[in-house]
């Protein structure tokens, strides 16, 4: 057992792929191959087998947790003599750029919304709470995009706290990956879902990251169950570079793309740019700010080659 796994074993139950897959029980696969193709990311080979082996057991586990949460709330309301309030169950999904957080989030949204309870499941990404490029430029933070200081944490915490207080309608800003910026005057309306999936790089940050300021309130304070999607540094770098090259041949060719100029350079130069962006920005952010939050997650999914999950760690 390597040092990382030995440390995790103290606080987590470990499952290899086969052990985890056996926990699916009788949960049916309710997604078609066409739907899975629509859900997966640009650089991922998500298969029906992966959904059955990894995500169906996960959706079953989450269903148990959510049902337990509802029962606990009902007991408290009966004790207090209060009326039932619709408070969303919040699932946080964290991990590095290029690890496949968005695919995991979309897949869980599709699976959880199809459980017999017909729950309404909303998905919000923390990208919408990045400061605008104008603000980041003024503060000299354009090369720190995705780092904690690049987020409007005050509004993000306000958003999630209103969600958890049962507010009937909450607005979230919308981010465009094409424009690489917030879309002005565009909002996503979240109206009391049963489940909210919040996906982002730093959703597991807590006061431990700011020891000299005990007054911070963090997104993680409002999360009921958290998932960290993990992979080795080398795999993440490889996936990031491949994704960049695919974007260069696709989305970057759009004249409206913020990165349109990268579509004009040769493949060799594009690889050099991608490696630099990974090393100087995304890899640095991973090591400094994202990876240290991994062991705060309720569950860690560790990926191997081809984005296949090879092990799952569930907090005891």
Swiss-Prot record:
<dbReference type="GO" id="GO:0005737">
    <property type="term" value="C:cytoplasm"/>
</dbReference>
<keyword id="KW-0547">Nucleotide-binding</keyword>
<comment type="similarity">
    <text>Belongs to the prokaryotic pantothenate kinase family.</text>
</comment>
<keyword id="KW-0173">Coenzyme A biosynthesis</keyword>
<protein>
    <recommendedName>
        <fullName>Pantothenate kinase</fullName>
        <ecNumber>2.7.1.33</ecNumber>
    </recommendedName>
</protein>
<keyword id="KW-0418">Kinase</keyword>
<dbReference type="GO" id="GO:0015937">
    <property type="term" value="P:coenzyme A biosynthetic process"/>
</dbReference>
<dbReference type="GO" id="GO:0004594">
    <property type="term" value="F:pantothenate kinase activity"/>
</dbReference>
<keyword id="KW-0808">Transferase</keyword>
<keyword id="KW-0067">ATP-binding</keyword>
<comment type="pathway">
    <text>Cofactor biosynthesis; coenzyme A biosynthesis; CoA from (R)-pantothenate: step 1/5.</text>
</comment>
<dbReference type="InterPro" id="IPR006083">
    <property type="entry name" value="PRK/URK"/>
</dbReference>
<dbReference type="GO" id="GO:0005524">
    <property type="term" value="F:ATP binding"/>
</dbReference>
<dbReference type="InterPro" id="IPR004566">
    <property type="entry name" value="PanK"/>
</dbReference>
<keyword id="KW-0963">Cytoplasm</keyword>
<feature type="binding site">
    <location>
        <begin position="95"/>
        <end position="102"/>
    </location>
    <ligand>
        <name>ATP</name>
    </ligand>
</feature>
<dbReference type="InterPro" id="IPR027417">
    <property type="entry name" value="P-loop_NTPase"/>
</dbReference>
<dbReference type="Pfam" id="PF00485">
    <property type="entry name" value="PRK"/>
</dbReference>
């Amino acid at each position: 057992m390597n040092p990382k796994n030995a440390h995790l074993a103290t606080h987590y139950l470990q499952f290899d792929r086969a052990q985890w897959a056996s926990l699916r029980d009788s949960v049916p696969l309710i997604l078609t191959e066409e739907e899975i193709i629509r859900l997966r990311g640009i650089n991922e080979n998500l298969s029906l087998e992966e959904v059955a082996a990894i995500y169906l057991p996960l959706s079953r586990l989450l269903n148990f947790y959510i049902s337990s949460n509802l029962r606990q709330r009902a007991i408290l309301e009966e004790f207090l003599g209060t009326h039932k309030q619709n408070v969303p169950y919040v699932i946080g999904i964290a991990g590095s750029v290029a690890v496949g957080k968005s695919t995991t989030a979309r897949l869980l949204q599709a699976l959880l919304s199809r459980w017999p309870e017909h729950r309404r499941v909303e998905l919000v990404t923390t990208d919408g709470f990045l400061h605008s490029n104008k603000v980041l430029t003024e503060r000299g933070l354009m090369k720190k995009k995705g780092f904690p200081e690049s987020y409007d944490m005050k509004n993000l915490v306000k958003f999630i706290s209103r969600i958890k207080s049962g507010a009937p309608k909450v607005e979230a800003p919308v981010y465009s990956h094409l424009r690489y910026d917030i879309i002005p005057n565009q909002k996503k309306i979240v109206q009391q879902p049963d489940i909210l999936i919040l996906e982002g790089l730093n959703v597991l940050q807590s006061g431990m990251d700011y020891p000299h300021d005990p007054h911070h309130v963090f997104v993680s304070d409002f999360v009921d169950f958290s998932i960290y999607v993990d992979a080795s540094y080398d795999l993440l770098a490889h996936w990031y570079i491949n994704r960049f090259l695919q974007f260069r041949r696709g989305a970057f060719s759009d004249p409206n793309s913020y990165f349109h100029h990268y579509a004009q350079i040769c493949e060799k130069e594009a690889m050099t740019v991608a490696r630099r962006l990974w090393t100087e920005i995304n890899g640095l952010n991973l090591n400094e700010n994202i990876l240290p939050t991994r062991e705060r997650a309720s569950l860690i999914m560790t990926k191997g080659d081809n984005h296949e999950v090879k092990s799952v760690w569930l907090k005891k």
